[in-house]
């Protein structure tokens, strides 16, 4: 492969993206020279992909002291370089809505997704590092990921971040002010970040992709105002409004309470994408008819968590019934099964809602959540219990509720040590995996080098199913089923 001049090759590709013309070549040359350092003009490359070219320019800048050695500093420069191939926010929005109206919503969405990958806002190469596998369980095929895409902070970055003065700008990583933000040691680079504006019930919202996607076309819908997460009747209206505007996507919201909520409760937002989760495939276990809403198909879903599914053609009726279920749940207690609406003035009940279109009808899944703690379960009664926390101890948020486990990076190395232990080899297995590993040893009599990896995957899937069962309010036994029935009777069902 012929060597080409790195800077010239990068500039050629920038011009090909049509934000600049040949007339801008000298301007681009000098701007990039300033960012990366003189001398780069002599550097050659064999690479062709623009992201690879960007990485080589960043590497040169690090070697010549134009940018620091921490990953965040390098990301800031990388995003600034990729900003050259990213149109201005006004142009991105203009193109999106022109395509949406004149061609199709699907094409507009696809173009924006392609741009977000092309300009390295979606970190496709980092995402490819994630470990992923499906596991068959009694609830269907659950999905397991070990999340290796997000770079862990290096010691230099941590030390520098401690010295930095606190900044209140942007207020959080979901604020609109992130669009084009340079980034800093303790805050991600967003120079190449773009947000599509859209109207939702007379309010402006934003649509963007997730840089470290957990599934196909993982996107975020965000309130343009920085206000806390809140599940209300308006939430159901918003979710159903979004799936009508963004065909092919599901959308859901994290719960609005600690323990059962997501990692960001301070800014109203939803997550969506083009992916079919195990929960969506799960069948109705018990059919229901709610009084006054006989046109809505409803039922309890066969799922480890407690899910009521509603399906119908009338958005208004679905929103009204979902709101009735939410309001009933917020005030509902059943001490026989440790279900408590509030204690000491603290509310415990909320819902994790998910909306999708299926066979032309609107569908809502309402997952009942309870964030109580107890002496026995200080992390949460309906949260992964201590015996499974060696695998998963973090909150069970929207994505996991639907059947996709997001497991911590530490497990990659730790599970290799568990494999060695199961094979009787010398190992450094963490003590907290001991009971689990011994159970696996007892369960399988023929563990070998050939099958040990598959066995670990199957057992991880079983642990994740247990994690979801722990998070489920009504358990899959006679007591749980009867208690769930008492709740839906409280909402008002027709026998």
Curated annotation (Swiss-Prot):
4Fe-4S as UniProt keyword: no
Keywords: Carbohydrate metabolism, Cytoplasm, Galactose metabolism, Nucleotidyltransferase, Transferase
Catalytic activity: alpha-D-galactose 1-phosphate + UDP-alpha-D-glucose = alpha-D-glucose 1-phosphate + UDP-alpha-D-galactose
EC number: 2.7.7.12
PROSITE patterns, per the entry: GAL_P_UDP_TRANSF_II
Domain of life: Bacteria
Family: Belongs to the galactose-1-phosphate uridylyltransferase type 2 family.
UniProt-recorded name of the protein: Galactose-1-phosphate uridylyltransferase
Record organism: Ligilactobacillus salivarius (strain UCC118) (Lactobacillus salivarius)
